[in-house]
From Swiss-Prot:
Protein task: Has a dual specificity toward Ser/Thr and Tyr-containing proteins.
Record: active site: C86 (phosphocysteine intermediate)
Enzyme Commission identifier(s): 3.1.3.16, 3.1.3.48
Protein known as: Probable dual specificity protein phosphatase DDB_G0281963
GO cellular component, one term: nucleus
Organism domain of life: Eukaryota
Residue ranges of domain Tyrosine-protein phosphatase in the record: 2-142
Source organism: Dictyostelium discoideum (Social amoeba)
Length: 394
């Protein structure tokens, strides 16, 4: 299921079904910002995730995440591409995208909302999120009108970086800032012109402008012997540091990519086929790992008489949990081709063998509970009794 909308180059918004290998690789997405509750990131060795665990509720303070998501999106656009998604791609993800554009382009909430709406017409942030975005607009405006404090802080950070790195080139940084100033001036002219016509920014008329956006107006450009390496600290601010050990960093990245794409990692040790017709369905690599739940004690509405079924007696006579007795009876697989092809409508349904049409399991975008008690969302669940496990011939 391909539910991705491009806002501008390297910046996408979508829904939960968009988080699958085919879509992420198709749009060259390297960073995924997941703004939804109870989400378990997948393929963390291949993609970089930022999980904002919040509900789409008026009581949620989403504004406190704007700085963190801004830095993450900047990093993602620099490295390749970034996808911001929530469950439906309507409220939470749209709010994060609007906040990013407001700060990145120094424009109003109305103009930023227009840009995201042109890319994805179904967006509809809840009223509380809109109020927070308008409050954020006032904060950004205040910072622009009183830049001395911000500039002073930036100068202090730059001084610290100069002490650590003698190869820092301030002239190139000035050139980078001037390029962003030129873009902002050109964009302001476009906005003023379009505001005379229903006060709406037309993405078609500003495509060329967006293509010239520098990846980060706040990043430091270094000389050819150094490379800026952004690091996300606990306070959600990215400190720009420079390093001359690019060969080591590159080698490490290559090793990770080779490891994740090697035949051994791709195939795994086993393949799994339909028990009825022996049609190959998925591999070890497609099975999702999850933290084991507490077994029957996770089901609140029944089996209360078995709350101690997974406990044994320790040396001191105390009851201890025996996790080895909690067994997962199903495989939860990732969004591979055969499973995604059966999710063309609705929020949940059954999974069938593509060859003999035998029922294999079920799928649900909202998630299902494993027999061990863990909640998996989204879920593509196949009971182990429906498939045969076979060795992969190499």
């Amino acid at each position: 299921m391909n539910d991705v909308s491009r806002i501008f180059p390297g910046f996408y918004i979508g829904s939960l079904p968009a988080v699958n290998r085919n879509t992420l690789d198709k749009y060259q997405i390297t960073h995924v910002c997941s703004v939804l509750n109870e989400f378990q990131p997948k393929w963390t060795k291949i993609y970089k995730y930022l999980h904002i665990d919040i509900y789409d509720s008026p009581s949620v303070d989403i504004m406190k995440y704007f700085d963190k998501t801004f830095q993450f999106i900047e990093e993602g656009r620099k490295d390749g591409g970034v996808l911001v998604h929530c469950f439906a791609g309507i409220s939470r993800s749209a709010t994060i995208c609007i906040a990013y554009i407001m700060r990145k382009l120094n424009i109003s909430f109305e103009d930023a909302h227009g840009l995201v709406s042109d890319a994805r017409p179904i967006i509809y942030p809840n009223e509380s999120f809109i109020k927070q975005l308008k409050k954020y607009e006032l904060i950004l405006k205040k910072n622009r009108e009183n830049p001395q404090i911000v500039e002073k802080e930036s100068e202090e950070e730059d001084d610290d970086e100069d002490d650590d790195d003698d190869d820092y080139d301030s002239d190139e940084d000035d050139d980078d800032d001037s390029e962003d100033d030129d873009f902002e001036e050109e964009f302001d002219n476009v906005v003023k012109k379009k505001n005379n016509n229903n006060k709406k920014v037309n993405v078609k008329n500003t495509t060329k402008v967006f293509s010239n956006i520098s990846i980060s107006s706040e990043q430091t450009t270094t000389s050819t012997t150094t490379v800026p390496t952004p690091t996300l600290n606990p306070e959600t601010k990215i400190e720009e540091t420079t390093t001359t050990t690019t060969a080591t960093a590159t080698a490490t990245l290559v090793e990770e990519v080779v490891e994740s794409t090697s035949p051994k990692a791709t195939l795994g040790e086993h393949r799994y086929s339909c028990r009825k017709c022996s049609k190959d369905l998925f591999l070890d690599f497609d099975i999702l790992d999850h933290e084991q739940g507490q077994g029957q004690t996770s089901f609140k509405w029944n089996k209360r008489d078995n709350t101690t079924c997974n406990k044994s007696v320790g040396a001191n006579g105390e009851q201890i949990e025996d996790q080895n007795k909690v067994i997962c009876t199903s495989y939860f697989i990732s969004e591979i081709e055969f499973s995604l092809s059966q999710t063309y409508s609705g929020m949940e349904g059954k999974l069938f063998c593509p060859s003999c049409n035998e029922k294999l399991g079920s799928w649900s975008w909202s998630g299902e509970q494993c027999s061990c008690g863990a909640w998996i969302a989204p879920s593509f669940q196949i009971p182990k009794t429906r498939v045969d496990e076979k060795k992969v011939l190499k």
